[in-house]
Design a protein with these regions (language model features):
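Detector for C-terminal structural segments
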Residues: 26, 172, 214, 218, ...
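N-terminal lobe/hinge region of extracytoplasmic solute-binding protein
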Residues: 38-89, 201-204
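A structural "hinge/loop" feature
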Residues: 41-57, 81, 108, 130, ...
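Gly/Pro-rich hinge or "lid" segments in bacterial periplasmic/extracellular proteins
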Residues: 71-72, 149-156, 160-161, 167-233, ...
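Aromatic- and charge-enriched surface segment that lines or borders ligand/interaction sites
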Residues: 83-131, 164, 252, 302
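Ligand-site clamp/hinge motif
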Residues: 196-199, 225-272, 399
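Structural transition elements
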Residues: 208, 297, 303, 327-363, ...
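A bilobed periplasmic-binding-protein/Venus flytrap-type ligand-binding module shared by bacterial periplasmic
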Residues: 222-226, 286-311, 507
């Protein structure tokens, strides 16, 4: 990430056009073929402005494109729908030059008007996008966020193939934001025709188009013959079957009936799979920029009291929790995961101390504890982890009833101001949208992200830290990189002083695929948030 920041800052200084980086195709890749992927839950939405979980992230990526992209399987930025861009000397104005001949899957040509519409839409509070806060550096964002404007002042259409975006401050993460799903381009007429159901009737410029969605059964993607990246994708068809228990999906993979169990390897079967050389050869693993955590809703007493939140942090036996998932994770006491710029290996956080936790509860006025609810995603191992958390809380007098729900229901409850007192994030644990510490603050801990539909499930707001985050991200020069990371380490330490979360563990990513599939391992465990890059895998 430091190399990316340095190269971006150099571009800002020189104001040179940046051309697309080459991707070397796999020489063994073949065109054609169909695959089947399974999931336990149906997908909540395929609207890029709304979808924000590990399940729909890679699916949305295959249906839509943004101005920027990543070289497949890497953290290296490359232009997407913009074939090049220029940056002003002050680093605040980006001029994107769009590719000619790009079409939406409804047949219409994409233009700069679509870029303007898409960015206006994602930042409009009526859309309730959980990613709206990512665009806070664009001029006019605050007016959009408060409802006093209906379009972003800083986004201008220059001509049909040129769009100019002006920022209100230099932003070291801006090009990465332009590669996020939230920045993907959508056609106005399709959104208006479908209304709130656009996520069920997606129209984009991506490598695939959706041809069927039978709720509770399957979603079908077919190759977009007009895709602007010639020769891609390799697959003709992907069928996503839903309602599949992970253990059953693994059995079907072993029988050759499916190609990818989307929910990964069931923890109860992990030792068995890894102990069988034939099955272990099909496993792809990668350290993930991910943190699993418990949120405490500061809008819901008694979690408005710091001593209560500190007590909960001290009550959780994280070593025991990691054993539930066969040691595929390491306990943590901080927000940022190892490997993320700004991670502080010396920061330990709250130690496991049930006696100290009980003393803090008594100090807060709850010597006998209290009753609350803990929400959890209902697929294994999350209910078992939640039970372990429940037991730890009971030891200090907190009686937490478990609310085991479908993923979409947990996400909905978390986004409401006073619905979910506590949430175990497992299955929805925060994984990096891009490799920068700001991504572990803006969308999940900033004041803006605590609004309706957001992912700040603690509804935590520290305006001083919001200001510090903006100041850190204004450091765009190469010589400021170390200072910027130091600033972010300090911000995260102050977050933990407020204790809105219990960071529990950092988990490695494990997935499997059938032996008939090809493609580099990095495509099945993509390092930039997309679990699987469907655009580049293939049938042998």
């Amino acid at each position: 990430m430091q190399k990316l920041l340095a190269s971006t800052a150099l571009v800002l200084a020189l104001s040179l056009p940046v051309m697309a980086q080459d991707y070397t195709p796999d020489p063994a890749a073949k065109q054609g073929g169909e695959i089947t992927v399974t999931y336990h839950d149906d997908v909540a939405t395929l609207d890029p402005a709304i979808g924000y979980d590990w399940q729909n992230w890679s699916m949305i990526k295959s249906l839509f494109d943004g101005l920027m992209d990543y070289v497949p399987g890497t953290t290296t930025l490359r232009p997407g729908l913009a074939e090049s861009y220029d940056v002003s000397k002050d680093g605040k104005t980006f001029t994107f030059h769009l590719r000619k001949g790009v079409k939406f899957t409804n047949g219409r040509a994409m233009t700069a008007d679509d870029v303007k519409y898409s960015l206006d839409r994602v930042t409009n509070p009526k859309t309730q996008s959980p990613g709206a806060g990512f665009f806070g550096s664009i001029k006019g964002y605050e007016a959009m966020a408060t409802g006093s404007a209906t379009n972003l002042e800083g986004v201008k259409v220059v001509d049909p193939l040129t769009v100019e975006i002006t920022l209100n401050r230099p932003d070291a993460t801006f090009l990465q934001v332009m590669a996020l799903n939230f920045s993907y381009i959508v056609p106005k007429e399709a959104v208006e025709a479908s209304g709130a159901d656009f996520g069920k009737h997606p129209v984009g410029t991506g490598a695939f188009k959706m041809t069927d969605w039978t709720l509770g059964q399957q979603i079908v993607f077919e190759r977009n013959a007009d895709y602007w990246r010639k020769g891609e994708p390799y697959l003709d068809k992907i069928t996503f079957q839903v309602g599949q228990e992970p253990v059953v999906a693994l059995l079907r993979l072993q029988k050759g009936e499916i190609d990818i169990p989307g929910d990964g390897i069931p923890p109860a079967k992990f030792t068995e799979v890894m102990g069988d050389p034939a099955q272990a050869a099909l496993v792809v693993s990668q350290a993930s920029l991910q943190t699993g955590y418990i949120t405490m809703n500061l809008n819901m007493p008694p979690f408005d009291k710091l001593e209560v939140r500190e007590a909960v942090n001290m009550a959780i036996n994280k070593e025991r929790v990691t054993q539930i998932i066969n040691g595929r994770a390491k306990p943590t006491g901080q927000v940022l995961p190892p490997g993320m710029p700004g991670y502080d290996p010396a920061f330990k956080g709250f130690a496991y101390d049930p006696d100290g936790a009980r003393a803090l509860l008594a100090k807060a006025g709850f010597p006998d504890g209290f009753e609350t609810q803990l929400f959890v995603y209902n697929t294994d191992p999350n209910p078992r982890i939640a039970q372990a958390i429940q037991q730890d809380l009971a030891k200090i007098g907190i009686k937490a009833s478990l609310q085991s729900l479908a993923q979409a229901n947990v996400i909905q409850a978390g986004g409401e101001p006073a619905s979910a007192a506590m949430i175990w994030s497992g299955g929805m644990a925060w994984a990096a949208d891009f490799p920068d510490p700001s991504d572990f603050f803006g969308p999940i801990l900033s004041c803006q992200s605590g609004g309706p539909g957001g992912w700040n499930w603690a509804h935590y707001c520290n305006k001083d830290l919001d200001a510090a985050a903006q100041a850190a991200d204004a450091m765009t020069a190469p010589e400021q990189t170390a200072d910027r990371m130091k600033a972010w380490s300090g911000i995260m330490a102050k977050v933990m002083a407020d204790a809105p979360w219990v960071p529990v563990f950092n988990e490695s990513r494990y997935t499997m695929h059938s032996p008939r599939l090809g493609g580099a391992n990095e495509l099945y465990a993509d390092p930039v948030a997309t679990p699987i890059n469907f655009d580049y895998i293939y049938v042998k």
